[in-house]
């Protein structure tokens, strides 16, 4: 699973997800992409599950780029622990996704295969998504 090698601070505040994605909102590598239409936290396990779903569908054809990285630590307290006594220890890693962010890119396959692969991947993700392609001018 994806996670940073090392971080400056072990714990982060929750933060707010306002506005649209300023960076990473256009296709950079592939011909087709999966773009977020909602904001949310995408867990490292969900990123991997979506990648596996796409890879299995396209078999050995094409290339996939993951355009998000989970760099925000989520903390949790042990079960049956009373409130207080400080913040819990880091438990998992998430990527903060805003509307417009390109999550995955793909090339080397037909549009029908890419569309279906991204549909399978989108079912694994907690945010709404849409299919975009380079030739259609990013609208689909």
Swiss-Prot record:
Keywords: Ribonucleoprotein, Ribosomal protein, RNA-binding, rRNA-binding, tRNA-binding. One of its GO terms (biological process) is translation. InterPro entries: Ribosomal_uL16, Ribosomal_uL16_bact-type, Ribosomal_uL16_CS, Ribosomal_uL16_dom, Ribosomal_uL16_sf. The keyword Acyltransferase does not apply. GO terms for cellular component: cytosolic large ribosomal subunit. One of its GO terms (molecular function) is rRNA binding. Belongs to the universal ribosomal protein uL16 family. Binds 23S rRNA and is also seen to make contacts with the A and possibly P site tRNAs. This is Large ribosomal subunit protein uL16. It comes from Geobacter metallireducens (strain ATCC 53774 / DSM 7210 / GS-15). The gene is rplP.
